[in-house]
Amino acid sequence: MNSRERVIRAIEFEAPDRVPVTHSVLPAALMRYGEKLERVFRDYPSDFGTGYTYTQYEWLLSGRKRYVDEWGCVWFKEQKGLMGQVKGHPIADWKAFETYRFPTLPDKRLGYVTGSGGSLFERMQWLRGFKNLLKDLMTGRREVILLRDKVVDYNLQVIRRSLESKVDGIGFSDDWGTQDRLMIKPSLWREFYKPAYKRMFDEVHKGGAHVHFHSDGYIMDIIPDLVEIGVDALNPQFSCMNLEALGKVCAGKVCVVSDIDRQRILPFGSVEEVRESVKRVISIFGSYNRGLIGRGEIGPDVPLKNVKAMFQAFKEYGKYPLTP
């Protein structure tokens, strides 16, 4: 069984030979560890091939604190290698919306397609500003509906461009949760955002690809909705939810891309704690038709010994059938 077959079988609950794994690393970690981290990745290869890419990669690794992206959003970072935050919002004033121009699509002649479906909630935040957007959603302004639809239309073009390259999956990323709740009421999410996501997910499935969705924070309330509208592989933030409860919601319904606790265990835990965390994750999410992909985000504060322990544990405990 090759890596591609292994991942597809995990997503489609068709019994892979082991838990497939993927590398998820912040540029700041690569800056800190360099070749030592690359060596770990060679020892424990990803089943996804090429890892994550960043459009602002050169800026992330530079000493410049300010960056203006192709959307006109102004980013500031405090530390090299970390994403930073958007501080300048091109549509902070709705008057600017009338003349705002969406960016041109990437030139497909560049030959490298990431398989990204983009973001929706976060893109709207960056364009309007977080507080402005929440006010818009609560008051139901006409412009915020138009903005949502324009962002979706743009993302649909990106999705179609990616599908032309025959990718296996399209990834979406929107951080919807705080530590213990959704950022907006679930009812508002269902009314305003759920139909928009469905438009994009339907396009992915029409093109024969899987839908991958990432969200940080507590999102338990909307996981059944995400599954209903077509998410095939879900990457939630484990440290914000009860894993046993999450397992009951996801088991047999959606493949889970793990998030080994990056708030405590990966950066500050012992090697044994990392191994036990991986073992627990496999027992909860890998036991039902093997719908699990192994992952843990590697930041600059994660010791190399814990990175090795995580991948070794997935290799050791993730062979199917699972040992009780």
Show the residue positions of the predicted features.
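Active-site loop segments of alpha/beta catalytic cores
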Residues: 1-31, 68, 77, 99-324
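A common structural microfeature
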Residues: 18-20, 47, 64
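Cofactor-binding catalytic cores of oxidoreductases
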Residues: 23, 56, 69, 90
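Short, surface-exposed, low-complexity cationic segments
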Residues: 30, 78-100
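Glycine-rich loop at the start of a catalytic domain that most often binds anionic cofactors/ligands
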Residues: 32-41, 64-68
